[in-house]
């Protein structure tokens, strides 16, 4: 018999780049999880906006099992039917003409930045290599993407960083305009800064970036790793704004919990990538592609996307009610089912402590920095699960406030 696994084993065996919760989930169904002791949690964290259809969705299990009974992997020397079907679904549903598949959002952003550099070098020369990104952004953990993310805490220990990356203030078109010029090859931006505090871009800001990119022959990259696949109430957030990027990255919810990422591109942009210019061993894996294809089938419907907007209203109404009682938050903001509760000045920096109280009360939430409690639940979360989970969250907030004032 194998030895029992405990949370302490993490501290003994794992490289300590995470500080996971003190409990270990072992089973999930819908928006509920149970830990090793059988305690139930309502999951409003969603695997950080990954579990778009909740845990153990029966149709996703069926898609995975069906493909698993056929074959698992061949490598990029061969294509497969599931990945081609998935590519066609993404092309039909978006602006894109071409798709590159990988395993994560970081890989998708890495591919986008490499493509942008190559596009500029091929068309205009090697002097056109500048990348403009934004402060408090997050684009992944590779050296290139962590450098593009405007959070020094994630990159400062890994110098020297890739050059020619500059950061403007988010939602400030004048700040961006001061950096974007004819040496810029790309601008990369999140339509909603997720890790940066759940901050939606303004319409004028994204339209302004599109105009600046057009003026200076730079590619506009939308990082929709967190906002994509129905999270905001549209299949992709760019559809809210009426701004079409040249490149778009997607991952997280695309696999519903199975690792998959993709770079979507126009024909013109994709044309600079030829055999051998980029690649990945596992990207386009038939298991991942079969699951992602079913995810798109289930999410890209008017009923599901309209339901996300309805659920947004459920959350915001109830969170405002909670806040009216406990007075923790200065603002509830976001789009669709990516929602942030901003702590007021009296509780600044204590988002982690609130998330820990929430877990004790039986509800899982996220943070986005020290000042924002973040919600990214399943897109099909039921009204009963919302009510139960937010009742537990309210109890956690009450306990947190009373403990602080006692």
UniProtKB/Swiss-Prot annotation:
Pathway it works in? Amino-acid degradation; L-arginine degradation via AST pathway; L-glutamate and succinate from L-arginine: step 3/5
EC class, as a word, reads: transferase
The record, for InterPro entries, names: Ac/SucOrn_transaminase_bac, AcOrn/SuccOrn_fam, Aminotrans_3, Aminotrans_3_PPA_site, Class-III_PLP-dep_AT, PyrdxlP-dep_Trfase, PyrdxlP-dep_Trfase_major, PyrdxlP-dep_Trfase_small
The answer to keyword Transferase applying to this record is yes
Biological process (GO) annotations held by this record are: alpha-amino acid biosynthetic process; arginine catabolic process to glutamate; arginine catabolic process to succinate; ornithine catabolic process
Q: Which residues carry this modification: N6-(pyridoxal phosphate)lysine?
A: 252
Gene3D superfamilies with a match to the protein in the record: Aspartate Aminotransferase, domain 1, Type I PLP-dependent aspartate aminotransferase-like (Major domain)
- The entry's keywords: Aminotransferase, Arginine metabolism, Pyridoxal phosphate, Transferase
Reported EC number(s) for this entry are 2.6.1.81
Give the Pfam families listed for this entry.
Aminotran_3
Describe the reaction catalysed, as an equation.
N(2)-succinyl-L-ornithine + 2-oxoglutarate = N-succinyl-L-glutamate 5-semialdehyde + L-glutamate
Names of required cofactors? pyridoxal 5'-phosphate
- One GO molecular function term? succinylornithine transaminase activity
* PANTHER family recorded: AMINOTRANSFERASE CLASS III (PTHR11986), SUCCINYLORNITHINE TRANSAMINASE (PTHR11986:SF113)
UniProt-listed NCBIfam families:
arg_catab_astC (TIGR03246), argD (TIGR00707), PRK01278.1 (NF002325), PRK05093.1 (NF003468), PRK12381.1 (NF009047)
This chain's function reads:
Catalyzes the transamination of N(2)-succinylornithine and alpha-ketoglutarate into N(2)-succinylglutamate semialdehyde and glutamate. Can also act as an acetylornithine aminotransferase.
The UniProt entry's sequence similarity note says:
Belongs to the class-III pyridoxal-phosphate-dependent aminotransferase family. AstC subfamily.
Its recorded name reads: Succinylornithine transaminase
The opening ranks of the lineage are: Bacteria, Pseudomonadati, Pseudomonadota, Gammaproteobacteria, Enterobacterales
């Amino acid at each position: 018999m194998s030895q029992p696994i405990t949370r302490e084993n993490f501290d003994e065996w794992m490289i300590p780049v995470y500080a996971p919760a003190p409990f270990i989930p072992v089973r999930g169904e819908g928006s509920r999880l149970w830990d090793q002791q059988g305690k139930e949690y309502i999951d409003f964290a969603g695997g950080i906006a990954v579990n778009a259809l909740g845990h153990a969705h029966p149709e996703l299990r069926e898609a995975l099992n069906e493909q698993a009974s056929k074959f698992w992997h061949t490598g990029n020397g061969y294509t497969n039917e599931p990945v081609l079907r998935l590519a066609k679904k993404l092309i039909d549903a978006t602006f894109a003409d071409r798709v590159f598949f990988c395993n994560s959002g970081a890989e998708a952003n890495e591919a986008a930045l490499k493509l942008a550099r190559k596009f500029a070098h091929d068309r205009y020369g090697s002097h056109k290599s500048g990348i403009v990104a934004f402060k408090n952004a997050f684009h992944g953990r590779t050296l290139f993407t962590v450098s593009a993310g405007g959070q020094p805490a994630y990159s400062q220990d890994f110098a020297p960083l890739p050059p020619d990356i500059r950061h403007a203030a988010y939602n400030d078109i004048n700040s961006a305009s001061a950096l974007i010029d004819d040496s810029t090859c790309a601008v990369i931006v999140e339509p909603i800064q997720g890790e940066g505090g759940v901050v939606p871009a303004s319409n004028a800001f994204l339209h302004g970036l599109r105009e600046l990119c057009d003026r200076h022959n730079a590619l506009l990259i939308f990082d929709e790793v967190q906002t994509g696949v129905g999270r905001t109430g549209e299949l992709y957030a760019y559809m809210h704004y009426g701004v079409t990027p040249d490149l778009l990255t997607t991952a997280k919810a695309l696999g519903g919990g199975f690792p998959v990422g993709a770079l979507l591109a126009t024909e013109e942009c994709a044309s600079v990538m030829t055999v051998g210019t980029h690649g990945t061993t596992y990207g386009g894996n038939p298991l991942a592609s079969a699951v992602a294809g079913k995810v798109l089938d289930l999410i890209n419907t008017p009923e599901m996307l309209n339901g996300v907007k309805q659920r947004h209203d459920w959350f915001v109404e109830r969170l405002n009610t909670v806040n009216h009682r406990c007075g923790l938050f200065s603002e509830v903001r976001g789009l669709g089912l990516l929602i942030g509760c901003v702590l007021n000045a009296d509780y600044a920096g204590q988002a982690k402590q609130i998330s820990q109280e929430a877990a004790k009360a039986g509800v899982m939430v996220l943070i986005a920095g020290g000042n924002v409690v973040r919600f990214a639940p399943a897109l099909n979360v039921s009204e009963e699960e919302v009510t139960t989970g937010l009742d537990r969250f309210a109890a956690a907030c009450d306990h947190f406030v009373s403990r602080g004032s006692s």
